[in-house]
A protein has these predicted regions:
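Catalytic core segments in nucleotide and nucleic-acid processing enzymes
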Residues: 1-35, 269-432
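Residue(s) in the substrate-gating loop at a strand-loop-helix junction
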Residues: 1-266, 271-272
Length: 432
C-alpha cells in the first residue's frame, strides 16, 4: 500500500513506475474514488485536480484511498508546521482531531486530541483506534439492553394474550397461545449502529492493532443484527442518564459511518474516503466554540439560521431564504451575524480590500438589513502575514449606521474561546 500525506492546496507528484512509487495508474484510481465521493463533485475536482504529472489537493481534509494507495490530506493551520515533516503532521493532525471533536460532540479534550495526533497513523486510523478503545472501555460496564415488545405463539401464556390473533390465525390451533410480551434484549438500534461501524471499519482499516481490536469487537457483537447503514434507526436511539456514557460513542460512530465506501463482493474496500470540506468544518467548529465562549452570558448561538427571506412575492410567499453561518442572539434580538471563511485574508498594505470577496460583502449587507443587526463580521483563520489576530478591518455600511468587521482567529493555540469572547466584546458593545 502506497501512502502519501499532503496539505490542502499542495501538489502530489506522480512518479515514474518503480517500487514505492505513486504512479499514474494509482493517481487515476484515486481520481475515480474522488469522483464517486459525495464531496467530490462530478469528476472528483473538489478533492483533486489533475495536472498530468501531479495532483493538487483541494480544500478538503481527511483520508481517501483506492486499491493500492491512500492519501491523507491535512489542513494548513498557521503556526503548527507543514505536512512535509513528522512534527508538523503530528501538530496539525492533533488540531484537526480537536476540531472534529468539537464539531461532532466527541467529548475529547485538547490534551487527548494532541496525544492522538502524535500517533504515526492517518487521521482515519487514529479515529478507528479511538472508537475501538472507547467501545471496549464502555463494554466493561455491560452492553446496553432494552425491553422490546415481541410476538410469539407459545404453548403457555407469556405476557398478555393477543385476542384478535388467537381467534383468527390460531382459531384451529388451540394448543398454541398468541402471546405479546416484552423481552430484555441487546439487539437494539444503538448496538446495531456499533455493529455496522465495526463491520465497515474492518473493511478499510490497515493498522494491525486496529484490525485485531475490530475482530475482537465483532465477536462481542456477533448476536446483534447487521443492519445496512442506510437503514440504521438513529431516531430510535434513546439516551438518558442511565446510558449517557454511550452518547460520545454514538456520535463517533456516526462520524465514521458518514464516509463514502465502495466495497466488493470479497468484503474489502477498493475505494473509500472520509473527507471534510474545510469551509464547513471551520464554520461548525467556530459555532461550537462560540457557544462555549458565550455560556452563562445570556447570549445564544444559532448556526445556519433560516428564519429570514430576501423577497416576498405579490401573493405574500417568501422567496430566497438566507442562511448565515452564525447568528448571536440576546433573547430574540440578533446582536451579531458572523460568516466564516476558510481562506487567507490579505494585509491591508498589500490589498486595501484585504482579499475580501465582493459577493461576501453583498451577502453581509443583506444579513445586516434583514436581521436589523448593527454589526456583521467576516471571520477568517489567522496567518503570519498579518500583524496579530483579532479585528483586521472595520467598514461603515453606506446608507445606514451598521458596520462590517473583518477579523481573524489563531487556531494554533489553546485560547480560541478567549479569543472569540474578546473579539465579540471588542467588535460589538451589545455583548457587554
Amino acid at each position: 500500500m502506497i501512502h502519501r500525506t499532503v496539505s490542502e492546496w499542495n501538489y502530489l507528484t506522480i512518479d515514474p513506475p518503480g517500487d514505492g512509487a505513486f504512479t499514474r495508474d494509482l493517481a487515476d484510481r484515486l481520481i475515480a474514488v474522488a469522483g464517486a465521493a459525495d464531496v467530490g463533485g462530478a469528476d472528483g475536482g473538489r478533492i483533486f485536480t489533475d495536472h498530468h504529472r501531479r495532483l493538487r489537493a483541494q480544500q478538503v481534509v481527511g483520508v481517501i484511498a483506492a486499491q493500492g494507495c491512500s492519501v491523507e490530506i491535512l489542513p494548513k493551520i498557521e503556526g503548527l508546521g507543514t505536512a512535509e515533516d513528522e512534527t508538523g503532521r503530528t501538530n496539525i493532525r492533533g488540531r484537526l482531531i480537536h476540531m472534529l471533536a468539537a464539531a461532532y460532540d466527541l467529548d475529547l479534550s485538547v490534551g487527548e486530541a494532541v496525544q492522538l495526533g502524535s500517533q504515526k497513523h492517518t487521521i482515519l486510523e487514529v479515529l478507528i483506534g479511538l472508537f475501538c478503545r472507547r467501545l471496549n472501555d464502555a463494554l466493561r460496564e455491560g452492553m446496553p439492553r432494552r425491553y422490546v415488545e415481541q410476538e410469539d405463539d407459545l404453548a403457555v401464556l407469556r405476557g398478555r394474550l393477543d385476542v384478535q390473533r388467537q381467534f383468527t390465525t390460531l382459531a384451529f390451533s388451540p394448543q398454541k397461545m398468541a402471546c405479546r410480551f416484552e423481552e430484555l434484549t441487546p439487539d437494539i438500534p444503538l448496538n446495531q449502529v456499533f455493529k455496522a461501524a465495526i463491520g465497515r471499519l474492518a473493511q478499510v482499516s490497515r493498522a494491525p492493532e486496529n484490525q485485531r481490536r475490530l475482530r475482537e469487537l465483532d465477536l462481542i457483537y456477533s448476536d446483534i443484527s447487521l443492519v445496512p447503514i442506510g437503514a440504521l434507526r438513529w431516531d430510535a436511539i434513546t439516551l438518558d442518564r442511565t446510558n449517557h456514557r454511550w452518547r460520545g460513542l454514538r456520535d463517533l460512530a456516526r462520524l465514521l459511518l458518514q464516509g463514502d465506501y465502495q466495497t466488493t463482493s470479497h468484503g474489502r474496500a477498493p475505494g473509500f474516503s472520509l473527507l471534510f470540506p474545510m469551509n464547513d468544518l471551520f464554520e461548525i467548529y467556530i459555532a461550537r466554540m462560540l457557544e462555549k465562549a458565550l455560556k452563562g452570558t445570556g447570549l445564544s448561538v444559532r448556526a445556519q439560521d433560516r428564519r429570514h427571506y430576501c423577497l416576498v412575492d405579490r401573493a405574500g410567499s417568501r422567496r430566497f431564504q438566507v442562511r448565515p453561518d452564525i447568528v448571536v442572539y440576546r433573547g430574540s434580538e440578533p446582536v451579531m451575524v458572523i460568516d466564516t471563511k476558510w481562506k487567507r485574508i490579505s494585509d491591508r498594505i498589500e490589498d486595501p480590500k484585504q482579499g475580501v470577496g465582493q459577493a461576501d460583502v453583498y451577502q453581509m449587507m443583506a444579513y445586516s438589513r434583514l436581521y436589523g443587526c448593527p454589526r456583521v463580521m467576516l471571520l477568517y483563520p489567522h496567518h503570519a502575514g498579518l500583524n496579530s489576530q483579532g479585528e483586521t478591518g472595520r467598514y461603515h455600511i453606506a446608507g445606514c449606521d451598521h458596520e462590517l468587521v473583518t477579523a481573524t482567529v489563531d487556531l494554533s493555540g489553546p485560547s480560541l474561546v478567549q479569543q472569540l469572547l474578546g473579539l465579540c466584546d471588542e467588535v460589538s458593545p451589545e455583548f457587554a
